[in-house]
Amino acid sequence: DPYRHRTPDAILAECKRNIEVYGANYIDFWDDLSFHSLRSTEQLVDAIIGSDLRFYWTAAIRADLFGNPKIVEERRITIAHKLREAGCVNIGFSLESSNAEILEMMNKKVELEYFNESVRILRLAGLSLSTAVVFGYPTETPQTIRETFDQCAKNAIYPSIGILIPLPYTEMYEYAKEHGYITDEDNYLTNMTERQDLCLNMTQMSDEEFMNCIQEGASALNEQLGLGLNDLIKTGKQPAHKGSKLTRNQNDFSFNYAEATFHEK
């Protein structure tokens, strides 16, 4: 279905409802298409600044939103400061990997330099930043894992670390089936947990070597940035399904990392 862009007024109306009905004082704009261009981003933050609403918020964006050097630097910096003025406290955008071959397999059409530039611009505005990386594509090696952690170190940012989980109806899912990594779909899907667990290894490394490389890279980055983290990757594995065999159709799968329960006053 085509993406239906929402106006700043429509977005603010929903924010106002959540504040008035649920007492919300923090909102997460999880849909990065809400900030698909600098123009739409500026329109939304100007609307927030001009409204009587006061709330803290975070947002997910594409790495090229503030990182594209073709856009005048002064304009990018100005809008970054407006984000802060409008109540934004954190911006997230994914690095995924620093290896060109893996990025191509991901079909990620964002230059690596854009990530570095986005970090620079947004930090000028005093914003907190978060990013995510994904390990486990077929061409992943100890070297590519190190390269990705080195890129994080270069930008002084600790990532949310995920392991590739091919999901149904994606190219990587079809790749995994065609190359013999997934031979029993029911077994794979019922034992699949979440992105911080190793559910399927499509690299040429053993499971132990693969996870050790990630742990070593995360540990070194943790020490280099002086974060003092105890849990480098996850806080605990989600239990796999233990019930009877599931019956599925194409609408069975909905993956949402931002779940919340609201209770009206």
Question: At which residue positions do the language-model features occur?
Answer:
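Radical SAM [4Fe-4S] cluster-binding motif and immediate context
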Residues: 1-130, 146, 150
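Short, flexible micro-motifs
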Residues: 1-3, 97, 139, 165, ...
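Short, solvent-exposed turn/loop segments enriched in Gly/Ser/Thr/Pro and often Arg
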Residues: 32-36, 62, 135-139, 162-171
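Bilobed periplasmic-binding protein-like "clamshell/Venus-flytrap" ligand-binding domains
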Residues: 130-131, 158-163, 223-231
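Repeat-solenoid scaffold signature
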Residues: 138-150, 160
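Accessory C-terminal segments flanking Radical SAM cores
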Residues: 156-182
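Radical SAM enzyme core and accessory elements
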Residues: 171-176, 185-265
